């Protein structure tokens, strides 16, 4: 029996800002640290399937920007077939800005970009 998986979904670059606490409305606070990583619900599912041994293909969209190139490379590094990921010349690659506090609570703001245009 073969394990073939096709995922249709979002592709984002996640940027996480680590903070001691969330700001009050109108308040500006400083992040303790910042990190970026591949993300998006669909991309995360495809990576999980591929790492579980499934032959995995992805259907989605990225922008024609450095973030899109980064995401295509990241998915390919996990042996995910990226031939069905379109490159959108008009919209940027999706992104998520994640604020994570010291208690592990988060707020997430997403820019859909090429994901929504698809």
Short names for language-model regions:
Residues 1-61, 66-70, 76:
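Glycine-rich phosphate/adenosyl-contacting loop at the front of the ribokinase-like
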Residues 52, 91-94:
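Short, basic and Ser/Thr-rich N-terminal targeting/leader segments
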Residues 84-88, 98-118:
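Conserved phosphate-binding/catalytic loop of the ribokinase/pfkB sugar-kinase fold
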Residues 74-91:
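A glycine-rich helix N-cap at a beta->alpha junction
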Residues 55, 81, 105:
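Residue-level detector of anion-binding/catalytic polar loops
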Residues 37-44, 89-92, 115-118:
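Short secondary-structure boundary/capping elements
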């Amino acid at each position: 029996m073969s394990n073939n998986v096709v995922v249709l979904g979002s592709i984002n670059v996640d940027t996480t800002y680590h903070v001691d606490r969330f700001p009050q409305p109108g308040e500006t606070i400083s992040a303790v640290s910042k990190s970026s990583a591949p993300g998006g619900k669909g991309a995360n599912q495809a990576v999980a399937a591929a790492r579980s041994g499934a032959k995995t293909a992805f259907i989605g969209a990225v922008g024609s920007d450095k973030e899109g190139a980064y995401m295509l490379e990241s998915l390919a590094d996990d042996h995910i077939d990226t031939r069905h990921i379109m490159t959108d010349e008009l919209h940027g690659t999706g992104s998520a800005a994640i604020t994570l506090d010291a208690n592990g609570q988060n707020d997430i703001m997403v820019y859909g970009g090429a994901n929504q245009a698809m």
